[in-house]
């Protein structure tokens, strides 16, 4: 396993890129089947989901649209619990199937807030599509239809996920080494 140091923390490889890409394709295949005959709007949550969204879209072969919003609930390695919308949604989602593309569902607080916000715009359906899910850390009930990989309650970085804005460019996913 390789290690990387970001700022004052050391991380080691936990999910290699090849495994990530295999799981992303499996999720895309399910979405293609589930939304056949529909034109969903993929709503990617920046900054963390940019790599996942890009790789996912390469395998989506149904008609679709993609847009982006930006929410923040992290500072360093802990969730602040404060969620603010930085970039809003401009598309009319009334009557549309919306697939929220997220890098990770941790406590679920950010996703719950997002579902509440989007629900006021009367979509036909809201669907959660996350690269990573920490089932042991969920504090709110969520119907997560598409979770590519379940992980333990560790702090991770890479493949779009950051530690204080660094490490997003790493191809693999790394776990914080507890020393």
Residue ranges: model-predicted function:
Residues 1-179:
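PRPP-associated nucleotide enzymes
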């Amino acid at each position: 396993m390789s290690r990387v140091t970001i700022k004052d923390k050391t991380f080691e490889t936990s999910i290699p890129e090849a495994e990530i890409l295999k799981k992303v394709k499996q999720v895309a295949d399910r979405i293609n089947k589930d939304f056949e005959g529909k034109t969903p709007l993929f709503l990617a949550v920046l900054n963390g989901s940019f790599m996942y969204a890009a790789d996912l879209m390469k395998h989506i072969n149904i008609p679709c649209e993609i847009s982006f919003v930006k929410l923040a609930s992290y500072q360093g390695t802990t969730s602040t619990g404060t969620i603010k919308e930085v970039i809003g949604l401009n598309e009319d989602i009334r009557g549309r199937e919306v697939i929220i593309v997220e890098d990770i569902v941790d406590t679920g607080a950010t996703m719950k807030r997002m579902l509440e916000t989007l629900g006021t715009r009367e979509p036909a359906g809201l669907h959660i599509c996350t690269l990573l899910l920490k089932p042991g850390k969920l504090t709110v009930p969520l119907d997560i239809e598409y979770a590519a990989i379940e992980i333990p309650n560790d702090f991770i970085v890479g493949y779009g996920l950051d530690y204080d804005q660094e490490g997003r460019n790493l191809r693999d996913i790394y776990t914080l080494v507890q020393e």
